[in-house]
Amino acid sequence: MSDEDFDLDLDDLKRRMDGALASLRTEFASLRTGRASASMLEPVMVDAYGQKTPINQVGTVNVPEPRMVTINVWDKSLVGKVEKAIRESGLGINPQLNGTIIMLPIPELNEERRRELTKVAAQYAEHARVAIRNVRRDGMDQLKKFKADGMSEDDHKIWSDEVQALTDAEIKKVDDALENKQSEIMQV
């Protein structure tokens, strides 16, 4: 086999690692930081029309003030279900009804809750690191197969170094995102 037959798809590895980072950012967006944001409701599903539905598909989510989220529910019959879904979501928000509009005042976080949220953020980041390392392992396993099939030692070392450099860069992005999220959570 020639060296051209041993072509590791670094773009695919990077795409998969970036997917882990995108997933982490989505998880971070769902963490309540004491500031109102529409994204904090993304994980909340409403039992609407016989299936679990995201809140943004049953109403308009707005952030009129820094500590207030409003949901204008389109179907009046779903207002109670949306309210119930928010109460049971574990976000620690107490919905207030005003006709078809549900108001969600966002309380300030106490010190203990802030520390809990930083630990949750650290767990999310660790899951992302593990996912990135799993992609790295897949790439290294592929390189081992190439080496067994006749790839030169030098080429194997070059490719291994590239995979490791890519992994290190992606892990640094995770660490930076975690640091930013933790400082956002701890901000009073």
UniProtKB/Swiss-Prot annotation:
Function of the molecule: Responsible for the release of ribosomes from messenger RNA at the termination of protein biosynthesis. May increase the efficiency of translation by recycling ribosomes from one round of translation to another.
Family in the record: Belongs to the RRF family.
A GO molecular-function annotation: ribosomal large subunit binding
CDD domains on file: RRF (cd00520)
Pfam families in the cross-refs: RRF (PF01765)
NCBIfam families: frr
GO cellular component: cytosol
Entries under InterPro entries matching the protein: Ribosome_recyc_fac, Ribosome_recyc_fac_dom, RRF_sf
Chief site of localization: cytoplasm
Places the protein is found: Cytoplasm
GO biological process, one term: cytoplasmic translational termination
Keyword list, A-Z: Cytoplasm, Protein biosynthesis
Name listed for the protein in its UniProt record: Ribosome-recycling factor
Gene that this polypeptide is encoded by: frr
